[in-house]
Structures are given as structure tokens and as C-alpha cells.
Amino acid sequence: MATNYIFVTGGVVSSLGKGIAAASLASILEARGLNVTIMKLDPYINVDPGTMSPTQHGEVFVTQDGAETDLDLGHYERFIRSKMSKANNFTSGKIYSEVLRKERRGDYLGATIQVIPHITNEIKERVIEGGKGRDVVIVEVGGTVGDIESLPFLEALRQLAVDVGREKTLFMHLTLVPYIPTAGEVKTKPTQHSVKELLSIGIQPDVLICRSDRAIPSNERKKIALFCNVPERAVISLKDVDSIYRIPELLKSQGLDTFVCDRFRLDCPEADLSEWEQVLYRQANPTGEVTIGMVGKYVELPDAYKSVNEALKHAGLTNRLTVNIKYIDSQDIETKGVELLHGLDAILVPGGFGYRGVEGKIRTAQYARENKIPYLGICLGMQIALIEYARNVAGLTQANSSEFDKDCPQPVVGLITEWQDESGNVETRSDESDLGGTMRLGAQQCHLIEGTKAREVYGAETIVERHRHRYEVNNTLLPQIEAAGLKVSGLSADRKLVEIIEIPNHPWFIAAQFHPEFTSTPRDGHPLFAGFVAAAKAYQDSHKA
């Protein structure tokens, strides 16, 4: 079967939920037996989001093969079974960087390098390459139609539609249909103008997804269809819902998947969304609730911890519990004290970079350890737990990470200086290395030690989890810390790097160097988060008595 392409654009305003809409459509098509993948094209000039501020851009999602990508790829993986890779996300910066590299190498034989055709050709080549072997490729373009930054991408997709044939392509445009309370009606004019903007660059949308806080009335849908030159059945009303996992059924109920299959002349069975119905049932019928404190550095923007937030919700679904997340700035722990942690059922310390707020995180780990509160540390959350234990239990009173104190006399956490990359080449790092693309990234095997809590939680001897870090446990000082009672429960495949630590005489204290949140999904959850939330409920129950 030849590959079919769905191009997703947004208009009127940003943050309409293009990624969620694209992922929801993909999940329906996948449920119809189609081989689907999703790509995200980001117009910013950064090569990737790896060095962008989490409080501006949100989290960096890491793929199996180690790509640092937009958080929308996390949505994609949570909605469909297909895994994302480096091919599923690229930016203007990456495109320009590659074109300039080819120009320096002489690939263009002295031609004058221009946006058209060189930049647009590079975009088209990457879209085609990323979609090889798929029945349907959904391509989301970041930003809003009318933005200068998006123009090369939109032009490339317009050309691609001509190249592969309009019968193999479909343009899906998300717009805002606002409700004006004083008029008592929704307004379609912004949608009409957004489509007009698309038409001005040569793109006629085939489907309109109309975002609103309420269902779009039939007469307004007819009006949109008439003035935007699309069939009425292709005007889809997408109202605000209480759960993003309700959107696949909402789109299916309006026949969007049928319209797509008809357009591409695909003969495939009806979608079975029973798994999503189970997710929604568990979400709507909890048997209790727990409150988990997330002590982080970027809590002013919850999207900085998007995958962690979702993984906690998934663990709630697994345990039939509502998970309430209380965000606490680790700097506030330093100034206001651990009283901010009172009343929590469990504590989670997520990843982060830099010294700011670290002592607050260390005090948080100490509070959880001393008060027997369930604790889950992720990445930096593991490193600070190790530092705390080394200082206050193992007698290494000057313990720290070389990330925070280069002259630390007891560096229990240090820079990884050498390892093999995915090609088998030895890579070397130093304090002077670039920040971008210089971490241990992607899926790595981890060996779990027999008789540990981690082994019990996972129920397996070997697991695969994704990493994003450049600092690791210093094995030189590890024996003294282990002698004081800390247990290493997970090691890298070569048994050289510490991946998981735990405290045996604590009800539930586990910290991992990797990022388990990146592989959690609403349908399957994740064992580490499921065990953590179950421990939170057990702690809550024991303190009610």
C-alpha cells in the first residue's frame, strides 16, 4: 500500500490542541488496523529542544533512539502503540543546519542556496523518509498559519501534496470557534479568515476541526462548510472535554475516521475503541484518592513535567484512584521549610539541571526518608537522594555532585566522561563540552537485583528504560554508602553504572537514574508509578487508623 499523508495545521490562535487531535485521529486509524505514525515539524531555529528552558517550552520528550523532542511526541506515544524516533520530529534549525552542511560539502554543485527549492526539498525528503512503510503518516506543523516561521513548512507540504497526488494527501486544519456570551452565539468569522490565510498560500483544507467550549450547532457547521469550501461532514466539532482520552470517541462519533478512509480509499474494519472505554470507565469510577507532592524547579509551568503528570494519572487508573498533584517549588523548601510537605501521601522529586533549588530537594528526600513517606526520585531525584543519604547516614558530610560543586571533596555524583554511542563509537565528555546533544540519551538496558523492591515492582530481571543525563553515581564512594544501608537495586547492562537505588528499611523509597515516565501509557500504565501510587494509598490508610 502506498503511504497516505494527513497534514495538520492550526489557525486563529496557538494551543488549540493540534497534537492531541492528531494523536486521537491516529489512535482511531490504528484501531482500524492501519500502520500509523505521527511527525511533528517545529518552526523554531533551535536544532532541538534539548537546551530550551522547560518553563518556556515545556518538557523535553526522549525517544527510544535518544532524540530530544517536542512534548507532543509524548502525546503521540500515549495515544498509539507505535514508538517515535528521531525521524518523527525536526525543526527549522535542524533543516537549515543540514542544508548548510551539504552546501559546505559541495552537494549543491555551486548553486545559490534558497528557501525554495533547497529548504523545502529537505523538508519533503524527511517527511517521505519518516513515513516509509506506513499506511498513514500524520504530519503536524507547529505554530499558527500566518506565522512567518511556518511558511517554508507549509510550502513544502503544498508541494508534497502535488508530488504524491492529492488523492494521497489530506489537509486537516484546526481553528477556534469562539462563543460570545453577550451575543449568545458562536462566531465562525475567525475560522473563515484562517482558511482564507491558508488558501493564500495554495492550500485548501479538506477537514476543519472546530475547537470551542461547546458543541458547534448544525447551522453554524453548515455555514462553515459553505464559506470554507469543505463538505459538511468534514466540519468536525471538537468541544472542551474533561479528559483528553475522550477525544478519540468524540472524533469517531462524527465520522472523521470514515471520512479519512473514504478519501484514501482504504477498506478497513470499524475501529474498536474498547480499550479507551476502559480507560474512561476507570477514570470516572475511582475508589479513592491520594495526594502526591511534586517537588521541582520548574513547577510554575506544569507542562515542564508533562509526562510525569500523565504517568501519575495512568498509575491512578491502574489503582482505580484519583491522583491529586501538589506542586511545590524546591526553593520554597529552602526558605519556608519542610512544613510544606505535611499532609502528603507520597513525594516525587523529578529531574532537573543546575544548582538552583537543589538543597530544597535534598531536604525533601531527607523528610521522606525519616518520616517513612513513599518516595520516588527520577534522574536528579535519584542523585539528590544519594547525596542526602551519604551526608546524613553514611557519614560523608561533604557529599555533593560535581555538577553543583566542581571542587567537592566527596563527589558521590560525577560527570560521565566516557561511554559508547549507539554506533559503538566511544564518546568523551568534559565540563567544557557543548550542552546540546551531549548526554546519555535513549533506551538502555537495566539489570534488576534479585530480592529488591525494584525487582518486585517490575517483575522482571531485565528492563529497558530511557535516559537523559550527563552525571552518574560515583562508584568509588559507593561501598561506604552501601555499608550504611543503601541498596543498589538496578545496574546498567555492563554492571558499571548505578540505575536504581532503594532503602530496604523504608516502606517504599525507590529512585531511578532513568525516566520511567516516558514509557507510561493510559492503557498500560507503568509498574514503577503504579507501585508508587499504591504505596501512597497504603501510607494514607495506615495513617487513618
UniProtKB/Swiss-Prot annotation:
Disulfide bonds: none annotated. It comes from Actinobacillus pleuropneumoniae serotype 5b (strain L20). The active site is at C379, H515, E517. Catalyzes the ATP-dependent amination of UTP to CTP with either L-glutamine or ammonia as the source of nitrogen. Regulates intracellular CTP levels through interactions with the four ribonucleotide triphosphates. L-glutamine binds at G352, L380, G381, M382, Q383, E403, R470. Mg(2+) binds at D72, E140. It comes from the Bacteria. CTP binds at S14, D147, I148, E149, K187, T188, K189, P190, T191, Q192, K223. It is an enzyme of class 6 (ligase). It catalyses: UTP + L-glutamine + ATP + H2O = CTP + L-glutamate + ADP + phosphate + 2 H(+); L-glutamine + H2O = L-glutamate + NH4(+); UTP + NH4(+) + ATP = CTP + ADP + phosphate + 2 H(+). The keyword Metal-binding applies. Residues 1-266 are annotated as: Amidoligase domain. Homotetramer. UTP binds at S14, K187, T188, K189, P190, T191, Q192, K223. GO terms for biological process: 'de novo' CTP biosynthetic process; pyrimidine nucleobase biosynthetic process. Belongs to the CTP synthase family. Its EC number is 6.3.4.2. Residues 291-542 form the Glutamine amidotransferase type-1 domain. Allosterically activated by GTP, when glutamine is the substrate; GTP has no effect on the reaction when ammonia is the substrate. The allosteric effector GTP functions by stabilizing the protein conformation that binds the tetrahedral intermediate(s) formed during glutamine hydrolysis. Inhibited by the product CTP, via allosteric rather than competitive inhibition. One of its GO terms (molecular function) is identical protein binding. CTPSs have evolved a hybrid strategy for distinguishing between UTP and CTP. The overlapping regions of the product feedback inhibitory and substrate sites recognize a common feature in both compounds, the triphosphate moiety. To differentiate isosteric substrate and product pyrimidine rings, an additional pocket far from the expected kinase/ligase catalytic site, specifically recognizes the cytosine and ribose portions of the product inhibitor. ATP binds at S15, L16, G17, K18, G19, I20, D72, K239, D240, V241. This is CTP synthase. Pathway: Pyrimidine metabolism; CTP biosynthesis via de novo pathway; CTP from UDP: step 2/2.
